[in-house]
């Protein structure tokens, strides 16, 4: 699952405290849907996803993005038990929504990109390494029901 050092935990928690969950969530999910258009099929109920500007301005995309990052914020409090933290969400996405688990990795990578954009020089290679470890572990936890 990925072992987090105390330094990783401090790095992740410190940056997370500065993240605007609403803005970063909407941008992360929006970018996922624009950059990887095949992921849109899981969001047919979201209305207009016909263009990048439609997606980035879509209130349902923003709301769900906020929900996703709020869930991630809960996980940050439980880095040593991500599998347990995401057990129900893994079940939902696997059994009911049939989301390809690869999409969790894509979303994590997009989040890292968004954080890099938002935090610029503060998002050092060391910070990126800790966050990449975390989003990889979260993707693995969300995929656990699939195995």
Curated annotation (Swiss-Prot):
InterPro entries: Globin, Globin-like_sf, Globin/Proto, Hemoglobin_b, Hemoglobin_oxygen_transport. Red blood cells. Belongs to the globin family. This is Hemoglobin subunit gamma-1. PANTHER family: HEMOGLOBIN FAMILY MEMBER, HEMOGLOBIN SUBUNIT GAMMA-1. The modification Phosphothreonine is found at residue 13. One of its GO terms (cellular component) is hemoglobin complex. One of its GO terms (biological process) is cellular oxidant detoxification. It comes from the Eukaryota. Residues 3-147 form the Globin domain. Coiled coil: none annotated. Gamma chains make up the fetal hemoglobin F, in combination with alpha chains. Heme b binds at residues 64, 93. The modification N-acetylglycine is found at residue 2. Heterotetramer of two alpha chains and two gamma chains in fetal hemoglobin (Hb F). The ratio of gamma-G to gamma-A chains in is approximately 2:1 in infant chimpanzee, and 1:2 in the adult.
């Amino acid at each position: 699952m990925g072992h987090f050092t105390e330094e990783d935990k401090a790095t992740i928690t410190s940056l997370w405290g500065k993240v605007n969950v609403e803005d970063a969530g909407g941008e992360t999910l929006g970018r996922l849907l624009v950059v990887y258009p095949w992921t849109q099929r899981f969001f047919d109920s979201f209305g207009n996803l016909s263009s990048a500007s439609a997606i980035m301005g879509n209130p349902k995309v923003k709301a769900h993005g906020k929900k996703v990052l709020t869930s991630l914020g809960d996980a940050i409090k439980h880095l040593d038990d991500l599998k347990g933290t995401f057990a129900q969400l893994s079940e939902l996405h696997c059994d009911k929504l049939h989301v390809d688990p690869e999409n969790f990795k894509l979303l994590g990578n997009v989040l890292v990109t968004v954080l890099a954009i938002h935090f610029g020089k503060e998002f050092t290679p060391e910070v990126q390494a800790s966050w990449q470890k975390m989003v990889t572990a979260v993707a693995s936890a969300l995929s656990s029901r699939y195995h």
